């Protein structure tokens, strides 16, 4: 099992490391808050985001800090008390398979999906200290918005994306330089920020379950703020392996208004769960 700090999702992504931030007690008042806007009239997406409907699961330590836990059969060397949350068979692995939104692969690719799924502990790229990529990474933990760009920060601080929103289109040279997070540009569709990303490598999965993709992957993310609630939805297109675009389950996240909230520094990635990988016990 690798240690990598990521933003959690019950449906889309696998959490591979602990994330600790300040408690977000004030974020409960979301429905009646006014939507802040930038000087040009666009919704201001800036802030720390988490929890809410379809957001990350909330666990708290004895000091009230919100923590995300390794989905492993055993605790990591520096892990917070695991409790039952580490048993992937009864939480994320199970609930992830209950989601009705799943990618539909072309017939010739299903054998590979099944093989990767059955051999997850050996084949899943996140166990090799690789980034989760998009859309598996899920929504950002923190957004910083300016007039010309948005910056998405994810758990642990290692992964971030700088996305222009000044109307430019994809740079054809950079779009061919395949990466884990692709080449993204954004534009406003009314009050919704639309982020269009291409230029991915084929080294990540769309989600747990062996859901691989090709380097023809395209991901469109939509973010809309209503008061202190951020609505997030991603759609995947991959003409090489998918029959049709896959619309992931929408998520709602709440604004964390605690001024002490922070993103902890990431740590080196290690393999420590080799016994389970060898015995093929599912993560």
Where are these regions (language model features)?
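PEST-like low-complexity, intrinsically disordered acidic/proline/serine-rich tracts
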Residues: 2-11, 17-283
């Amino acid at each position: 099992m690798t240690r990598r700090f990521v933003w959690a999702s019950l449906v889309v992504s696998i959490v591979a490391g602990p994330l600790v931030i300040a408690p977000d007690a004030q974020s409960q008042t979301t429905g009646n808050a006014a939507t802040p806007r930038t000087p040009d009239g666009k919704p201001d997406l800036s802030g720390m985001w988490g929890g809410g409907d379809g957001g990350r699961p909330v666990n708290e330590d004895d000091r009230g800090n919100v923590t995300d836990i390794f989905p492993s059969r055993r605790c990591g060397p520096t892990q917070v008390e695991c409790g039952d949350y580490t048993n992937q068979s009864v939480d994320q692995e199970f609930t992830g398979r209950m989601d009705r939104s799943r990618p539909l692969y072309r017939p010739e690719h299903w054998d590979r999906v099944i093989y990767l799924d059955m051999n997850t502990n050996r084949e899943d790229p996140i166990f090799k200290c690789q980034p989760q990529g998009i859309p598996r990474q899920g929504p950002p933990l923190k957004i910083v918005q300016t007039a010309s760009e948005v910056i998405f920060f994810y758990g642990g601080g290692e992964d971030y994306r700088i996305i222009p929103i000044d109307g430019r289109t994809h740079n054809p040279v950079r779009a061919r330089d395949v990466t884990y997070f692709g080449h993204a540009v954004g534009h406003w569709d009314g009050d919704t920020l639309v982020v269009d990303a291409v230029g991915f490598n084929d080294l990540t999965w769309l989600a747990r379950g062996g859901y691989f993709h090709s380097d023809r992957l395209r991901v469109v993310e939509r973010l809309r703020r209503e008061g202190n609630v951020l609505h997030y939805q991603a759609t995947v297109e991959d003409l090489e392996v998918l029959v049709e675009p896959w619309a992931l389950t929408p998520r709602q996240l709440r604004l964390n208004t605690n001024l002490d909230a922070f993103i902890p520094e990431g740590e080196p990635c290690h393999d420590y769960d080799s016994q389970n990988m060898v015995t093929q016990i599912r993560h």
